[in-house]
């Protein structure tokens, strides 16, 4: 399963990837806004928004890019490992 994580904390980026790997998922993590998001996102099975650490502009931009993709979008206000773990249990578990 491929996962894209948007938002979150910079210091947790590696931990997000390791946790996804433990669920046998490939993860891409974008903490900061990046240009050309559509090309970098690919076609993920699950997209996770950590909304507390994302600007509204980044959320809207990402949603526009994901309209044409067949992906599940999960929004979470907190960007903790336990929040990510519960999302992964629900979708990849």
Language-model-derived ranges and their functions:
Residues 1-24:
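Short, charged N-terminal beta->alpha structural module
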Residues 6-8, 32, 78:
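Cofactor-binding loop segments of dinucleotide-utilizing enzymes, especially the Rossmann-like FAD-
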Residues 8-10, 18, 41, 87-90:
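Catalytic phosphate/metal-binding cores of nucleic-acid and nucleotide-processing enzymes, i.e., regions
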Residues 24-40:
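A short, well-structured beta->alpha microelement
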Residues 44:
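An anion/phosphate-binding loop that grips the pyrophosphate of nucleotide cofactors and donors
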Residues 52-53:
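Short glycine-/small-residue-rich Rossmann-like dinucleotide-binding loops
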Residues 67-93:
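Ser/Thr/Gly-rich flexible loops in soluble cytosolic domains mediating phosphotransfer, phosphorylation
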């Amino acid at each position: 399963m491929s996962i894209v994580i948007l938002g979150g904390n910079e210091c947790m980026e590696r931990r997000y990837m390791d946790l996804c790997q433990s669920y046998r998922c490939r993860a891409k993590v974008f903490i900061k806004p990046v240009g050309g998001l559509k090309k970098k996102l690919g076609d993920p099975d699950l997209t996770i928004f950590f909304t507390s650490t994302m600007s509204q502009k980044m959320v809207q931009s990402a949603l526009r890019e994901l309209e044409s993709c067949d992906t599940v979008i999960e929004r979470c206000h907190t960007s903790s490992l336990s929040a990510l773990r519960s999302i992964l249990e629900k979708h990849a578990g």
